[in-house]
A protein has these predicted regions:
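A ligand-binding cleft/hinge motif common to bilobed small-molecule-binding domains
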Residues: 103-104, 121-130, 177-181, 202-203, ...
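Acidic, polar ligand-binding/catalytic clefts
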Residues: 89, 94-159
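Bilobed "Venus flytrap"/periplasmic-binding protein-like clamshell domains
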Residues: 54, 58-61, 74-89, 121, ...
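Ligand-binding clefts/hinges and TM-proximal coupling segments of bilobed small-molecule sensing domains
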Residues: 26-34, 41-44, 174-191, 228-230, ...
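Extended ligand-binding regions for polar small-molecule ligands
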Residues: 22-24, 28-34, 81-90, 148-150, ...
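Periplasmic-binding protein-like
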Residues: 58, 139-146, 213, 217-258, ...
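Extracytoplasmic small-molecule ligand-binding "clamshell" domains
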Residues: 28-121
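Short helix-initiation/N-cap motifs at beta->coil->alpha
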Residues: 79, 96-108, 152, 189-203, ...
């Protein structure tokens, strides 16, 4: 009997410890959302002390790309990059940007090798399994793009779904999901860079492609033969910051900073500046091993 009572008491103690831990964690999680930025800053932990490590895919103007100066020297630019610096500055950190292919950014966040990622992410439920989402900082749209010579073939979304069409989209993107949804019978060609999609469109290898509206408009400004023929409905339009999963303090801080950037007009200025730069000389893709524009 004594053994049974002792075991019962031990079980109750263990349950109370776990319940207490759960309550404490829940309280801490809840507390983050009620804290000010100044209260959060000392609680924010990053992979490298003093740095905010951000992954991005610089092939998506005006979000992220390389602006070229008169000597052809590339500078990482775009409103995602500007927002990244704004967030780092607000946290008292130095921004470290690591360029890579789009799907690589998701892998790095999933493996917790980056603090944040910005690459025109939409809040897709599948991605939420491997990263946390910030509040929406920019709302855009989705478009179906083709060349002028083929524009008359696409007057409605249903026109895209033909077996003899080759339809492009970026690997791992919302646009790839939309392509499969609206053109299941077509040959969906997923490419790692939007620049490759544009090149394939212009060369006639693709009949059309799903591209986010703002970057598509930037490409069309440089290549008049491109035509944004259709708006593509998507229920979760908007861009978010991807954040290292379970870093609740960083998530809460980023949300506060995004709210500040939207309120003080900084975000609108970042978008305006990026669109102006994107209309000039630029390179979209990864630089070579010497940090120069790849041939």
């Amino acid at each position: 009997m004594k053994k049974m009572i002792a075991l019962a008491l031990a079980a109750l103690m263990i349950m109370s410890v776990f319940a207490g831990c759960g309550s404490k964690e829940a309280a801490e999680e809840k507390d983050y959302s009620s804290m000010t930025l100044e209260e959060l800053k000392p609680l924010v932990k990053t992979l490298n002390e003093g740095k905010l490590t951000m992954v991005t895919s610089p092939d998506f103007a005006p979000y992220e790309f390389y602006a070229l100066n008169e000597n052809g020297e590339p500078t990482l630019s775009g409103f995602d990059i500007a927002l990244g610096h704004y967030i780092a500055d607000a946290l008292g950190l130095t921004l470290e940007v690591i360029p890579m292919d789009f799907d690589g950014t998701i892998t790095e966040l999933a493996n917790k090798k980056a603090d944040i990622g910005m690459a025109g992410y939409s809040p897709d439920p599948a991605r939420e399994k491997v990263m946390s989402f910030s509040a929406v900082y920019y709302t855009g749209g989705q478009s179906f793009v083709t060349v002028n010579d083929k524009a008359s073939q696409f007057t409605a979304l249903g026109d895209i779904n033909k077996a003899d069409y080759q339809i492009g989209a970026q690997i791992g993107s919302i646009q790839a999901k939309l392509a499969k949804e609206h053109a299941p019978d077509a040959d969906i060609v997923e490419l790692s860079k939007v620049t490759d999609i544009i090149a394939e469109l212009l060369s006639g290898k693709l009949d059309g492609a799903f591209i986010e509206t703002v970057p598509a408009q930037a490409y069309a400004a440089n290549y008049p033969e491109l035509n944004l023929v259709l708006d593509v409905p998507y229920e979760a339009e908007g861009s978010v910051v991807g954040i290292n999963k379970d870093n609740a303090a960083l998530l809460a801080a980023v949300n506060l900073i995004i709210g500040q950037a939207l309120e003080d007009g900084s975000m609108a200025q970042f978008v305006a500046d990026a669109n102006e730069l994107a209309a000039g000389d630029k390179f979209e893709g990864l630089l070579d091993e010497n940090g120069q524009v790849a041939e």
